[in-house]
Amino acid sequence: MTNIRKTHPLMKIVNNAFIDLPAPSNISSWWNFGSLLGICLILQILTGLFLAMHYTSDTMTAFSSVTHICRDVNYGWIIRYMHANGASMFFICLFMHVGRGLYYGSYTFLETWNIGVILLFTVMATAFVGYVLPWGQMSFWGATVITNLLSAIPYIGTNLVEWIWGGFSVDKATLTRFFAFHFILPFIIAALAMVHLLFLHETGSNNPTGIPSDADKIPFHPYYTIKDILGALLLTLFLMLLVLFAPDLLGDPDNYTPANPLNTPPHIKPECYFLFAYAILRSIPNKLGGVLALVLSILILVLMPLLHTSKQRSMMFRPFSQCLFWILVAHLLTLTWIGGQPVEHPFIIIGQLASILYFLIILVLMPVTSTIENNLLKW
């Protein structure tokens, strides 16, 4: 008798995606982040659902409803902090996942890569609208500053901003619609993730060497299921250490002050995972230029397949490209640090230099280095 998992219409899909999926035999722990992102998404949807049961999206009661969750709801504090820190974990995994794709040339799977970039934008949008919901000082002013950036769009900018606000400032209408967006977007992310997987399974996974691995495949279960479980346990350990010992480590103290439109915080900054993009935005003195640089800092990922000049797919055997890649990572970390600093003398110039080098490395130095490496190998 044929196994039910191979014949049943629903179980067949699961089987082909997670059990009998032929996987390369040499994929490293950098390939764990896809499953970790899935776990993060499920965790965020579940904790978010329980938070939504007690949260009220009204300017008068939003802040106190979050306080009520932490003080009065059974285990509300742990749900709230798992959701807040789970978002940080989500982004750490996302950046690792994208970095892996850049390093090993996974961007040559065009559909998978482009849907991944759309996913990144969607997750960033979700995190932004979610950060507004507790209605603290940083929530309010973050929403005001970031939505205001759209006013830099010529001709339609001001109308667009007022349309998003639902009035002439960030107010009740804005909070209500942001809650609606924050509730629906994770389900759109889940649907996009399925499409992402669908396209990935059309081609099969890449591997560290970048060489086709059709001749050496192993079943996903049990080899990679057990490996993913280990990754999940480590992620859970790290998340729970954060939640139970330092829940506010990555948050902003200003968000424990209720939103006050009459009092601007001395230093408005987004969550830690957006600081690199925020630093690029601030490093350009012109408003429209800053907004374009902000969008391009992420959208540049779409150009990666076009900028690939090497005759090898992966960076595994390309030491010069490896050096450039890690310099790029160092620049992103520098930008993250600068984004959290006040706009003062040494930080301004460091931010501008790091921003210029970020674009320079991706657009010029990496393609040129790849060409040089081709010539060194006499290709």
Curated annotation (Swiss-Prot):
Cofactor binding annotation: Binds 2 heme b groups non-covalently.
Localization terms from the record: Mitochondrion inner membrane
PROSITE patterns reported in the protein's UniProt record: CYTB_CTER, CYTB_NTER
Cofactor(s) demanded: heme b
Binding site residues for a ubiquinone: H201
Main location: mitochondrion
TM segment ranges: 33-53, 77-98, 113-133, 178-198, 226-246, 288-308, 320-340, 347-367
Cellular component GO terms held in the UniProt record: mitochondrial inner membrane; respiratory chain complex III
Family as reported in the entry's similarity comment: Belongs to the cytochrome b family.
Comment field (misc): Heme 1 (or BL or b562) is low-potential and absorbs at about 562 nm, and heme 2 (or BH or b566) is high-potential and absorbs at about 566 nm.
Protein function: Component of the ubiquinol-cytochrome c reductase complex (complex III or cytochrome b-c1 complex) that is part of the mitochondrial respiratory chain. The b-c1 complex mediates electron transfer from ubiquinol to cytochrome c. Contributes to the generation of a proton gradient across the mitochondrial membrane that is then used for ATP synthesis.
Protein name, entry field: Cytochrome b
UniProt gene name: MT-CYB
